[in-house]
Amino acid sequence: MPIRRNPATPTPGIPFARPFAWLVAWLVAWLVAALAFSAPAIAQRPEALWYARGEASITSFLAHADKVTAISPQTFTLDRNGTIKGGIDPRIVATARAKGVKLIPLVMNPGFDQPSIHRVLTDAGARARALVSLGRMCTDHKLDGIQFDIENVHVRDKDAFTAFARDAAAVVHKAGCTLSAAVVPRTGEDRGPTAYHQWIWDNWRGAYDYKALAESLDFLSYMTYAQHTGNTPAGPVAGFPWVEACLKYLLSLGVPPAKISLGLAAYSDWWFPAWDEKAGPRMRGHDISWTRGMEILGKAHVTPAWDDAQKATFAAWDEKGVFQYVWLEDARAFTAKLDLVRAYGLRGYSVWKLGDEDPKTWEIIK
């Protein structure tokens, strides 16, 4: 029951009321400032970059362009002589211009051929030609930016690739475009315990000096997918613990969150027994769309389950005595990884690729 006081009786402690109010206000202001300093800045609408390859990608882009910030068609190649070839489907160009979507096509070493990119990085003539070609590509196609999709670079070319990216950024920026790079992720500097781990380190993961690249480039698309592939046993395309471990490592190097676009998978994977004359009998992993994954499960009369640890949907079933496996990157899995973008205050996300996604994915993108 509240204490009733005589209005004429002075309230005890009134001489201290004003200083106490000042102290409370000061503490509140300090706490707000501390939280603002320590917490990551969360973008209201993270930049949504989607990759495109093939007709299904174009169809999806035309239907969902209003939820795409940047479109990156994989349609340009950089050959061993430093020559860039390719173009962009006019439907992509027209829709991007009409909807205000940035055009940031990929430039890749064709087939991710290692000897070709080694020559570009180490031969003076090919290197110079590549730099000129990048500047012309930017102006000739009236692009907003260019993104390197240069993969299967041997670790011995790490410094050469870093220097090439730095010089390319100067050329491309002068031409009025941004330059970014899609980079293969890793969780640390350890080559790993097995020959497989060491092979993937030497040829795929180890060649990226993330911090130096981030200093030269506008941002990095950090490809946290392909955790399991056709070269590995069945497993999630991008298991949540692995994705977050890769991201934490990148941040630990001092790469600013504002320069990180988290790579998200829209595709799924299917492992099944196969045989051909070259390879003989083997277990094969194959990238598939979400729609194809659901068709496979429907044909097998299998209901997938949710793996809460990996934040992914999966199924395994007996097909005449031999197991098959599907790991789906559905809308629920996509949401779990998208939450990392917000939690760590990242620039945005980069999705491989349009046309592979669960249609419900678009419902969760604001």
Each model region followed by its residue ranges:
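Acidic/aromatic/glycine-rich contiguous surface patches that form carbohydrate-binding/processing clefts
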Residues: 333-366
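Glycan-binding loop/region signatures in secreted carbohydrate-active enzymes
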Residues: 266-340, 361
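A cross-domain feature marking catalytic cores of carbohydrate-active enzymes
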Residues: 52, 75, 105-109, 150-152, ...
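Bacterial N-terminal signal peptides
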Residues: 22-38
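Short, acidic/polar
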Residues: 52-65, 124-139, 202-211, 329-340
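Conserved, mostly hydrophobic/aromatic
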Residues: 71, 148, 220, 262, ...
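Glycan-recognition patch characteristic of GH18 chitinases/ENGases
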Residues: 44-133
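Substrate-binding surface in catalytic domains of secreted glycosidases
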Residues: 80-83, 154-297
